[in-house]
Regions:
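Structural microenvironment flanking redox-active thiols in thiol-disulfide oxidoreductases
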Residues: 122-182
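Buried hydrophobic packing residues in well-ordered domains
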Residues: 92, 107, 111-114, 125, ...
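Thiol-/selenol-based redox modules, centered on thioredoxin-like
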Residues: 195-242
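Hydrophobic beta-strand positions
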Residues: 86-87, 209
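N-terminal targeting signals for export/organelle localization
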Residues: 3-82, 242
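Short active-site neighborhood of thiol/selenol oxidoreductases, capturing the structured segment around
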Residues: 97-125, 141
Length: 242
């Protein structure tokens, strides 16, 4: 039969071959679809292995340098979040977690009369503010560690001098012990146990990246340009995650 087919005229040979192929595909159509779906799945898996999705770590007290963590929470390995707070910003407005609901934010500690690292940190916060000025998903939050000195009027003066965008960036003051507790037990951002006494100064150069679930996703040196670049990159990674 094969010999007979091979000796057919070309038009008839093409016709016969076409009929054979149509018969094959009609008979194995389901198998072809299955193979196509499986191929797509395999290709997707291989792509994800070769190009893994970037995911930022979730920092827990037990996994952070013990110098930065209050002894009462050093055992915590999961579910750590930033505690609720109620502070006053540069416009005299009460600021709580509700103002940061469904927001990614960068937090730090500072005081307006600082002449060492604070000006550098504030300048770098301004850089972040400028880079993300049209991004309503990201906000900034700076906590004064000398709230007795940093009154609302003082914070407002400082905000105007630095070009703070009130809609994006809150400079907050308030109860000193509350701020120190936040710094030590929530932000994991200080190296000494402070209790809010008059001369008890807690202050580090850390910028803390907080996600929409109030979890810490990164620590950055607020005085270093390369850390600010990394922070901006990590914010974009976090946005994709959310």
């Amino acid at each position: 039969m094969f010999y007979d087919i091979c000796h057919l005229p070309l038009p008839q040979l093409i016709f016969c071959f076409s009929k054979i192929m149509l018969h094959f595909f009609s008979r194995y159509k389901f198998l072809g679809i299955v193979l196509l779906v499986l191929s797509s799945i395999i290709i997707t898996i291989i792509y994800q292995i070769i190009n893994p999705k970037e995911v930022l770590p979730v920092f827990q007290p037990a996994g952070v340098n013990t110098e930065l963590v209050d002894s009462t929470i050093q055992h915590i390995k999961k579910y750590h979040t930033i505690a609720d707070f109620s502070l006053i910003n540069q416009n005299g407005k009460t600021i709580t977690q509700e103002n940061y609901k469904d927001k990614i934010y960068v937090a730090d500690l500072f005081f307006t009369t600082c002449q060492t690292i604070c000006p550098i940190m504030t300048d770098n916060m301004v850089v972040i503010q400028e880079k993300l000025k049209n991004d309503s998903e990201v906000m900034l939050l700076s906590h004064s560690v000398t709230p007795v000195i940093d009154s609302v009027a003082q914070l407002k003066k400082y905000a105007l001098e630095k070009g703070v965008n009130d809609a994006k960036w809150n400079l907050v003051t308030g109860d000193k012990k509350q701020i120190y507790t936040l710094a030590r037990k929530s932000y994991l951002a200080v190296k000494e146990d402070g209790n809010g006494d008059e001369y008890d100064m807690i202050h580090t150069e850390n910028f803390i990246l907080v996600d929409k679930k109030k979890r810490i996703r990164g620590f950055y040196d607020g005085t270093k340009e390369e850390d600010i670049v990394q922070l901006l990159k990590d914010i974009q990674i976090l946005k994709k995650e959310n």
